[in-house]
Structures are given as C-alpha cells and as structure tokens.
C-alpha cells in the first residue's frame, strides 16, 4: 500500500542514483550527460510535486554523501598503502592453488590485498590445498600496484581489484611463519565454513563432478575448470554456473515450502527467510547476482513486484555491494532481471512465452554482450533453454542430496554422466562452430543502441516505426563490425608487440602473435593451468575490433 502512495516510481529513482554513481566513479561525458538528462526529466515531471522533490532530495543527498565518502576512502587507501608489510591474514575461501602458485585475498591493518606466493614444495602445496582455517602469513611481503589496461578491450586488472576494494598486490618473497588466526569474526566463520565445504568436495568427489558441485552449490570454480569453462563460454551458456535466479529460486523455494509444510504462518516467513538468505549469500561468495536474486525474492514476500521491486533492489545493492555496477556479472544480472520485469508474457501459451522471452532477452542484452565480450552465440538461446531445465530440475537437486549425504557415503557413480554431457557439448560445439564476432561498440555507439532499444519498446505496436528502428539497430551492429577506417595498431602482447593492419575494405594483416619461451622443466606438482599471451591480449583485441578472420599472418620471431 505504501508503494502506491509513494510520490515517485522507485525504479526511476534508482536510475537517477545509478547515473549519479557513474558520474562520481567513472567520470566521463556520457555518465554526466545521462545524469543531467535524467535529472531534467525528473524535474520536468515532478516540479510541482513537493513530496517527490523532498523524497529525491533526501535519498539523493544520502547517496551523494555515501558515494563521495567511498570515493574519498578509496583515494586515501590507494595513497597511504605502504611499500612493504610483515604479515597478512588470508580470507579462507579465497585460497586458490594453481601448480606452484598460491593466490588469495588478504587483510592487514584495515587494508585488503591480492596476495601471491610461490610454493616451495609439494608438501606446502598440499597444506594450502586442504586447509580450511583463517591463516596468518608472516615474512617479507612486498606491495605493488596492479597492472592497468594495456590494450583496447584488454583486461583491466587494476580496475577489477579496485571494484573489490583492493589497491595493492602483495607478493610474499620470504615466508617465515604460518599460524592460524586466534580470534575470528562471524564473517570469518562463514568464510571458513565455505572453505571447509569446498575442500570436502574437492577431496571426496571425482573430476568433473566436483566442479559442477562447487560451481552450482557454492559459486566456486577453480583453475582446473578452465578447459570446461572455455567450452561453456564458446557455447554461450557459462552463465548457468553464475549463481543467480535459478539456484536462489531452488534453495529459497524449497526452504519456504518446508517452512509452510511445518505449519509456520505466512506472516512469520520473512523473519526466517531473512537470516537464511544472509547465510546463503555468504556461503556462495556474496556476489552481485546472488544478492540481487535474494533481495528480489525477499521483496516479493511483501508483494513488491516488477519495476518497484527492481528499483528497491538496485538501491539496496548500492548499500550491500557498492561497486556492483563496475563488474560484468553485476551489470548482466541486473540487465536480465530488468528485462524480465519490463515484459509480461503470462497470457501467452508456454511455447510462445518461451520463444518471446528468449527473443526479448537476446535482443535486449545484445548491446551489453558486445560491449563486454564482442561476441554472441545465437544457438545459446536454445542451449540455455535446454540445459537450464537439466541444471534446475536434475543437477541441482541431485548434487544437493549427494553433498548432504557425503558425510555418510560418497556417490561418485554418476560421474560418467557429467563426462558424457561434456562430450555431448563438445560435439555440439564442433557442429555449430565458434560464436559470432560482432566487435565492441564505443560508448557513443553503445548509447545509440540503448536509445534505439528504448524507442523500440515505446513504438513496438507501430509497425512502420518498429521496422525502421530494427533496421537502425542492425546498421549500428554493422558499423561496429566494419568500421569505415584504415587501421594500423601495435598491440602489447607481453613480450614485444604485435602489429595489426586493416583496410577499409576489410583486408587484414597480422605481424607476430606474441609468445612465451619457457626454460627448463618443472615437476608435476609445479605444473599449472595457463593461458597463452594471445588469449589474454591479442585475441580480445581482435574480437573487440570485429575481426573474425586474418588474411595474412607474418611471424618474425625465432620461437615458432
């Protein structure tokens, strides 16, 4: 009832706050322009509504102070970071061992660091692989800033760490002592509990079954999953492992059903669901997609649905996970949720509803997919529909039961089923080929795409406008894929440069692809899962430029 009496739509308010966030933390002309445009639109529609002005002034003022505080604190932490520390406390469930390389998130004196350490022996590796305690590492620890973006569409590791409140990398040059932390907080307890569950799965279940169990139940995929991850990414269904609505709906739905069957009145459901949701969020890594789904589910208990639900969810996410809009997962998760809130296909038949939902989601999310990845797999719509049923109706319940019973008996007999499924997916990939390479739009092109889609939503019932707008959207995609310019680019590939040349006609020449020369051999325990320099530097650049084929390749280095 109070939502109906609210002087302003909460989703409109959330959009205004989101544009304010980007204005402060991204600070470019597009962010400032979006904020100014939304503010003018609001004032135009609510100028005479004093209640709306007061509400926006109050909420906007609070978030303005909040964002400025976060920005100032980040600046202080970056400037005041020391050059060296002598001990760091590791967050238990962030420990990752890849061959001889140990990585984790650590904390020391109010600062958070990305910690790296080169393991000295197989015994040391086994210890860090199997421990579930909060460890304090003491020794000589050098701090350094992370590497920023080196190429167009290259991964900006510095910005990625900054979105998690991390401004320095900590390299342990000499490890003197490893001791368990004595006094642990409630938050550290959940980190240890999650780590204990992950270690239990990794040591008791075979591969690849254990990867599906850690991924679907706890939102964790280790380096050993890289090969399968490339397969799922190529097919466009890697998002099935990103915990969100499917998993939250399963666990929260069954927990709610159990409470009702036990006779708990509906009026008391929220009191029990709230702490359960908090624990579930912590056990799954406290990610943006999980928090978004949990908040929306809890708000639905009060009858808050559609855009009001989405608006309040966005405002709460800014409090629980301030920089969620700087992460790919946060943006894509909220974009999918917004599209589902915006359209209503309930009156359609199940088949027609499924087709329309897939088409709307694919078209609405396409600008974001091209902006972040530069690729799109059309068959992913069909595969998502197929495998979401398999994951939701079979894998999730079965893996949950097997994990719960694993303290008594280990069910590894169905591991061949996972091997067969991956073989089947490999066959599908060989049949359908690689994703379409569409290129990455500039911010200007991206804004034009969003504007066209907004107008398409408004004028959908007018056929002439609809066809015209769809043609404009298609032309924008062609513009991104085939820029009308000649190009000569030097790409930093880690060891030297690669030179890329392209003419307006689309003819391409690539000189060198980068590489890494390794000297000597390593013991088996030291071998790590690695990706080539080209996969991290050159290939993302070519995909961002819409290049799907190289006409001429010239190699000048001797290590071919």
Protein language model regions, located:
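Juxtamembrane/interfacial segments around transmembrane helices
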Residues: 56-64, 81-85, 103-106, 185, ...
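Membrane-embedded alpha-helical segments of integral membrane proteins
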Residues: 4-44, 397, 401, 406-458
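Alpha-helical transmembrane segments of multi-pass integral membrane proteins
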Residues: 341-439
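Hydrophobic secondary-structure signal with a strong preference for alpha-helical segments in membranes
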Residues: 1-239, 466-560
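Hydrophobic alpha-helical transmembrane segments in multi-pass membrane proteins
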Residues: 29-30, 40-59, 228-381, 445-483
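Alpha-helix C-terminal capping segments
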Residues: 21-24, 81, 106-108, 198-205, ...
